[in-house]
Amino acid sequence: MQRKDAKTIIMYYRSIPEMKRLLQQERRELEDEYCGLHGISMDGMPHGTSPGSPVESAVVRLAESGASDRIREIDSRVQVLEDDQRYIQSALDAVNGRYKIILTMRYINGYSWGGISARIGAPDSTVRHWDSKALLRFGKALEDAGETGEILGRATRARV
C-alpha cells in the first residue's frame, strides 16, 4: 500500500467519531419528528399532539415519509463505521510503538512537525523520516489484516 493511501485511511479514522455523531444526531431528529408522544400528563397517561392513537399515527407518519428506511440506513452506516474503526485501530496497534506515537500525534491529534519533534526529543527531519516509515508500516499492517480495498474506497469517498 502506498503512503498516500495509508494517510487517507488514517485521516478517515480520525473523522469516524464525528461522522458517527452526525449520523446519530440525524437519527434522533428523525425519531423526534415522528414521535407524537411528548410526555406523560398528571393522570399518568401518555398524550400526543394528534388525534387518535399516538403510537398509531406516529407509525403511519413514519411509514409514509420513508423515514424508517433512512433510520435503517443510518444504523447500517454507523455499524460499518464502527467496524472500520475497530479494523483500523487493530492495524494501528500492530505498528511499532515509536511509529504509532508519530501517526497518532500527527494524523489523529493534529500536532505539527515541530510539536511532535519537541515531544519526542528528535530533530524535525528525523520525525519526518519516521513518519514516512510509519505510514509504510501502517499500510503493511492494513494489508495483512485484509479488507483494505473496501476501507480505502470508503475513506476516499469520505474525504471528498
Predicted feature descriptions by range:
Residues 120-144:
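DNA-recognition helix of helix-turn-helix
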Residues 95-111:
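Short amphipathic alpha helix immediately N-terminal
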Residues 1-91, 114, 140-160:
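N-terminal interaction/assembly modules
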Residues 103, 115-118:
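Hydrophobic positions on the alpha-helical face of helix-turn-helix-like DNA-binding modules
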